[in-house]
């Protein structure tokens, strides 16, 4: 009997191994089948569909900039699909811009489109509720004079962390600007002392960085696999951690803000003084229904505002500085303008920056606007999803499920756009849009009746960096003020130059977007 048991034990062990191998093999087959099916779905969705409009350009191009310009030249007044875009992107003529942008979300939705594009399930970027734009438009922008004073104080604190030596030293420009923008934005959104708290800084910056990472990582996978892979990405776990942290931080601040509101509701003067401190939380709560005045909702709103403010503003600011470094002939005219506006205090720690002074820096404003045109973050306006098949007033048919956008960059680079036409004005030579002219918009503003137009924060059908109409970026006035203030500090107190033997980073063009080498360094010294 014992011999029989001795003989059967190896068989049991062998059977166990066989079972494990069989299970592993079945799992492998299942995974392989799922991958094969997902790949088939992906190929079907990314293959060239049968479309009612022409597909323009090289389908294998890394950058779709040339495809867009080519399509605009061939089909300026009719739709075309942008070759190489995923999903296929229908570019519409500007003649239907206002008709499209005035449609309700039930017909044309940016939320549904961005749910896919920005992986809203994991980033929550597409869960922006109406309280955020309402707070920005009605409170933040209206209180800019007071906020600018707060930002200047924060800029003094932030710039103390910049190089202090009068000798040339190499710095990572993007990292330096990222931290500076995060500090200034935090001063407006959460106020002192939280805006300087290292944990809050890392959370607001980290949320921004990880959201971009999630979008880029999941974009490389088939839509079928994204729900399987997404929850396991380290960046997704990081976003959840940042949101939990934000909720914990917001809880006592919400309680304090609600208590202050109740205590001072009848005291208009004190309420106005409280507003002047620039805290975003008390404003935000006024636009939230009572059931959503929770730490989780306010924490999410704060992270969403941080994403919009920190990521885009840092990129825009970094591009402006790089263009100044590459085009040093603009530096002295900008410094001279600063001296004209601020007088001897232009290089003094006691310089007083206010809204009126910022508005008088026409050359700086023009340079910022031209860099935005020359180095856009995207070649098209924010895309939207057609929710119902329809026929537009001029006969253009749109199919349900189609992604649509307008050719912003092609408009900015075309002489057929009136603003960029050589014949736009007889008072000065209007350079081709293919040429960088930092004072282009300074000249345009000199035309009679154009003085209040062509500013860095203004929009129009010929300038779509911030979109246009009711969907124009509500935070653009805050962002441009922030950029100007940081540039004033740089120009007044620092010299900067390219590192020896390095040309400076070139704008990388990928799909419909552009990217910048965030690790590139420049040399700077205290003046």
Swiss-Prot record:
Cofactor: heme
Induction context: Expression is induced under gibberellin-producing conditions.
Listed PROSITE patterns: CYTOCHROME_P450
GO terms (BP aspect): gibberellin biosynthetic process; secondary metabolic process
UniProt: heme binding residues: 473
Protein name from the UniProt record: Cytochrome P450 monooygenase 3
GO molecular function annotation: heme binding; iron ion binding; monooxygenase activity; oxidoreductase activity, acting on paired donors, with incorporation or reduction of molecular oxygen
Family annotation (PANTHER family): CYTOCHROME P450, CYTOCHROME P450 MONOOXYGENASE AN1598-RELATED
InterPro entries for this protein: Cyt_P450, Cyt_P450_CS, Cyt_P450_E_grp-IV, Cyt_P450_sf
Pathway given in the UniProt record: Plant hormone biosynthesis; gibberellin biosynthesis
